[in-house]
Every structure is written in C-alpha cells, then in structure tokens.
C-alpha cells in the first residue's frame, strides 16, 4: 500500500470547512487552500498519481477535478479527458444522467473523437460524497469503451455512503471524514 501521509497531512492542515454551506445543515469542505499551496497541491497530485501508475487516461470531473486531473495526467504522462456538465460541449457527445437530491444532472464527453475504446482510465475528483457523480462518470467512460481501473479522490465523506455505491471500482481516498 502506498504511503499517502504527506498528502493526508496537507489536506488535514489546509482544508477550510464552511458550516451551513451551500445550505443549512451541510458542512462544506473547501479544498481551494490545498490547491493554492504549492507543496500541498504537489503532494496531493503525487498521491493520486500513485493510485494507478499504469493508467492511460485520467477522467477529470467538472470542475475541481479538472485541477487535479491535469496534474495527475502530467505526473503520469497520460492523457486527460474533461468530464463536463451538460451543455458545455458541442455535439456529438456521449452523456450519462444521474439522480441528485432534487432532480437529475447529466455529464458529457465528446463522442468518438477522444479514442477511449479499450484504454485504462482513472477517474479523479476532489470529494466523494454520495457517489452519484463518480458513478455516472465511471459509467460514462465505460460507455465509450474504456476500462475504469480505479477512482481516486482527495476527501471522502464516509457518512454519505459513496464508497458503497462505487463498490465495483477500486477506490482510493486520501482523507476520510
């Protein structure tokens, strides 16, 4: 097992917690201070890259996952695909809808032009909460023919059950709260 202690220390030390945001009763983990600290960002990217060193493509989830995914792809020498929220890409696109607490959302990637068929993909995002977004991302890249070899996040909120929802995929979270 890889030692992620430097990344865990940086995340624990630098994360800013905001109570009652974006709504009452929610405690929001703002990882912006982790990303803005050069050493913090470096050790987090290094730890995420260690999760799947042989991956061919990073699937970076809109929007904070873009910051991490680009760094991880650069570290590994792999490609990166931006998994976008609906309506941000020109057609044709592949899409995957998923359920939110109050409605649905859709994620998209370009159809056909990014060559995912048969390639190994690591899905990267900042936070795992309920797992809806990450599950939809994994299903989306699989629909393009990719093999999801793992999911890696900086912070996991265990009480929200996302790990169980993602049970079929190898999952690494640097910090669990």
Swiss-Prot record:
The keyword Glycosyltransferase applies. GO terms for molecular function: adenine binding; adenine phosphoribosyltransferase activity; AMP binding. SUPFAM superfamilies: PRTase-like. It catalyses: AMP + diphosphate = 5-phospho-alpha-D-ribose 1-diphosphate + adenine. GO terms for cellular component: cytoplasm. Pfam families: Pribosyltran. Its EC number is 2.4.2.7. Pathway: Purine metabolism; AMP biosynthesis via salvage pathway; AMP from adenine: step 1/1. InterPro entries: Ade_phspho_trans, PRibTrfase_dom, PRTase-like, UPRTase/APRTase. One of its GO terms (biological process) is adenine salvage. Disulfide bonds: none annotated. It comes from the Bacteria. Its main location: cytoplasm. Transmembrane segments: none annotated. It is found in: Cytoplasm. It is an enzyme of class 2 (transferase). Keywords: Cytoplasm, Glycosyltransferase, Purine salvage, Transferase. Homodimer. Catalyzes a salvage reaction resulting in the formation of AMP, that is energically less costly than de novo synthesis. Belongs to the purine/pyrimidine phosphoribosyltransferase family. This is Adenine phosphoribosyltransferase. It comes from Rhodococcus opacus (strain B4). The gene is apt.
């Amino acid at each position: 097992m890889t030692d992620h202690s430097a990344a865990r220390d940086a995340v624990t030390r630098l994360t800013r917690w905001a109570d009652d945001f974006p709504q009452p009763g929610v405690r929001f983990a703002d990882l912006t201070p982790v990303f803005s600290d050069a050493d913090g960002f470096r050790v987090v990217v290094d730890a995420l890259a260690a999760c799947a060193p042989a991956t061919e493509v990073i699937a970076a989830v809109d929007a904070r996952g873009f910051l991490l995914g680009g760094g991880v792809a650069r570290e590994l020498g792999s490609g990166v695909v931006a998994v976008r929220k609906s309506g941000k890409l020109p057609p044709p696109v592949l899409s995957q809808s998923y359920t939110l607490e109050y409605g649905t959302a859709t994620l998209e990637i370009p159809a056909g032009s990014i060559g995912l068929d048969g390639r190994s993909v690591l899905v990267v995002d900042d936070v795992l909460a309920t797992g809806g977004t990450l599950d939809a991302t994994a299903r989306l890249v699989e629909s393009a023919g990719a093999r999801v070899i793992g999911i890696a996040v900086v912070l996991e909120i265990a009480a929200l059950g996302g790990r169980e929802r993602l049970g079929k995929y190898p999952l690494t979270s640097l910090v669990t709260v």
